[in-house]
Each structure stands twice: as C-alpha cells, then as structure tokens.
Design a protein with these regions (language model features):
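Well-ordered, non-membrane alpha-helical segments in soluble/globular domains
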Residues: 5-7, 126-135
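Active-site metal-binding core of divalent-cation-utilizing nuclease and nuclease-like domains
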Residues: 9, 22-111, 127
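Metal-dependent nuclease catalytic cores in nucleic-acid-processing enzymes
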Residues: 14, 130-144
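Short helix-terminating capping/connector loops at secondary-structure junctions
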Residues: 25, 29, 142-148
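Short, flexible loop/turn elements at secondary-structure junctions
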Residues: 74-76, 101-103, 116-118, 155-158
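Short beta-strand-loop-alpha-helix junction that forms the active-site gateway
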Residues: 96, 108-128, 154-156
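Domain-level recognition of nuclease-like catalytic cores that cleave nucleotide substrates
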Residues: 147-210
Length: 210
C-alpha cells in the first residue's frame, strides 16, 4: 500500500517536470553525475556539511532533451488491457522497474526505483537496489544509451535518507515539498495498515489524487 501511494506522488511530480522540460526550445548538455551511494546517510547519522550538494554539482538531467516520456508500474498509467513494459530499444529485461524516463533523441534512459522498508533495512535495501541494475545498465550502455538509475527510499515510519533530496534535484523536482509529502504518505499508510491489522476484508486504496 505505502509503496504505490508514494510512487504515485513521485510519478506526478516527474510528469510536471517533464512537461516543463519538453517546453524548452534548446536542450543543454548535462555531464555524467556522480553515483548516489557516496552520499547515503543512515538514520540518526549527521550529514557532513562538506558533502552538501549544490546546484552546480548536480545539474538536473532533464536539461539534456525536450522529448521526454515517462511510464510507471502503476494502474493509473495503464489503459484497459495494456501492460507495463520497459523500452526494448534500451535493453531487454525481465526486471520489474518502478518507472522510467526516456529521451530517444538524446538516447538517455533514467530508471526510478522506490523502496519503502522498515527504517532498520534502509541501508541493505539501498545496496541491493544499486546492484540490481548493473547488468541492465551494462546492456543499455552497449546499445548506445546513457543509463541513469535513481533510487528513492522512504521508511515505513517516514524517515527519508539524505541522498533522496539529491535524487529529486536531479529531476528538477522541488525536493523539500515532495519529501514532506512522501513522509506524510508513508506515515499515513503505516497507520492505516496498523489499525486494519486484524481486518480480513481490508483493501488498499490511494491516499493521493489520481
């Protein structure tokens, strides 16, 4: 329940930024960005001020094109009878990827992966997600695509690791506002699940607009 509610909020924010980027007349060249794992901070750990991200260090990826398309593994993005499929032109894979953003002219594919574990499992899940797409990234690169993976974690009790802000900034998303929304969604979902823990007729539903 929490996963898809949080993912939908992210997807709507991505759609807004894509619409804005596609309205730009002239794309800019965006250099390769540093991997995110170097900025992962555990719950309760202080953030080193020297590692704070500036706009100069993290230009957003959507500057590189103006023909972006996105899709997410959510029913809100499916028409009746359609299936969610990762673009075969990038790579062939059976992996279930939460979402992707693609520009065919710039040959850039950005995959987005969300996980909503218990806070004590955040570090393990982050490492797992980093390794999960190594083969896919290699194949995409061999096929002539620039491949970027963006990983977002939101803990079941609402903790959001510090690197998530940088991740969202890479897509030109107003990180603070969206993170506050994701925190509230995760907490609400956990509360709903808790109060329905003995309800055998419980069904999930959306806590954000469709």
């Amino acid at each position: 329940m929490a996963h898809n509610n949080v993912l939908l909020a992210i997807a709507r924010a991505v759609e807004e930024r894509i619409t804005e980027a596609n309205a730009k007349a002239k794309p800019k060249e965006v250099k390769q960005l540093a991997p995110l794992q170097s900025t992962f901070v555990r719950a309760g750990q202080a953030l080193d001020s020297k590692k704070k991200v500036t706009k100069k260090e993290a230009p957003h990826l959507l500057q590189a094109a103006n023909d972006w398309k996105c899709d997410f593994d959510l029913p809100e993005f499916r028409s009746p009878g359609s299936s969610y499929v990762f673009p075969h032109v990038v790579a062939l894979t059976t992996l279930k990827i939460d979402g992707y953003i693609i520009s065919e002219t710039a040959r850039i594919c950005i995959v987005l992966e969300l996980t909503c574990p218990m806070e004590e499992n955040l570090v393990k899940q982050h490492s797992f997600k980093q390794r999960k797409y190594e083969e896919l990234a290699s194949e995409a690169t061999q096929n002539g695509w620039r491949f970027e993976k963006l990983i977002v974690e939101v803990g079941a009790r609402g903790f959001v690791p510090s690197h998530v802000r940088k991740t969202l900034t890479r897509l030109n998303i107003k990180a603070k506002a969206l993170i506050n929304k994701l925190v509230l969604l995760a907490q609400k979902c956990s509360y709903v699940i808790w109060i329905n823990r003995f309800n055998q007729d419980f069904q999930t539903w959306r806590l954000v607009e469709k």
